[in-house]
Amino acid sequence: MTKRRGNSTDRPPRAGSSVAPAGQRVRRWAIPGLLAAAVLVAIGVLAFGGGTTASDPAGGTASVRPVLGKAEAPVLIREYGDFQCPSCGAFARLIEPQIRAAYIDTGKVRLEWHDFAWIGAESRDAANAARCAGDQGKFWEYHDLLYQSQSGENQGAFSKDRLKSFGAGLGLGTATFGACIDGGNHLAAVQADFADVSSKGFNGTPTFVIGTQRIVGAQPFEVFQAAIEAALATK
């Protein structure tokens, strides 16, 4: 089976309503042997609609679930993304700032990050590095920098040396951050997230879950706004 690299989707929704209009760019993946490996190393696979505040793989470094926003915010957005995914980058650069300003900064929404690192080794290394930055309180700053620095897939844009240089630019402790990247301290948590995503049947990045609605792709702000307002109306 090969990866489908088309830019649109017409597949039916699963597990609640799903938004993914034709013509919207979405990265899709197929299920190769990577899935079996991810399942073997993952623990605590969650059912659709479940949640967690931390991943703590056996024998690995405890990896706190990155969350942006106030803990008491009534609506939760779960984002499943890959740092090499162009559509994920488009969302992060163009749509997410609007959601932050309208809903996260105002205390109505919190955004929870889940790694869907499927495009290749640089996706997994970038996801690990972002969590390493999170160890020093700068996950979201590093998240933003990764998406601003996208340049091809598995072509060196997110080599370990470059990932370390990004951390230096953010003022992260060089020795600690570099050791975390080289040691793959959070790779088990990244793989656990991948197995969780696989168990839900998601096959496009980015994917979002807001209440009972699933949104696939870098949809216009108005699509997210409608889903958020619907979720707020139930609170």
Task: Describe each region flagged by the PLM.
Residues P66-L68, A102, V197-S199:
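Short, flexible, glycine/charge-rich loop motifs used to bind or transfer phosphoryl groups or to couple energy/partner
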Residues V67-L68, F158, I215:
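Short clusters of hydrophobic/aromatic residues that line enzyme substrate/ligand-binding pockets
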Residues I43-T61:
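C-terminal region of N-terminal signal peptides and the immediate post-cleavage residues
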Residues A73, R78-A168, G173, T234-K235:
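Structural alpha/beta surface segment adjacent to cysteine/selenocysteine redox centers
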Residues M1-F48, R93-E96, S165-K235:
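C-terminal cap of thioredoxin/glutaredoxin-like
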Residues R65, A117, A130, S151, ...:
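Conserved short-loop catalytic and cofactor-binding motifs
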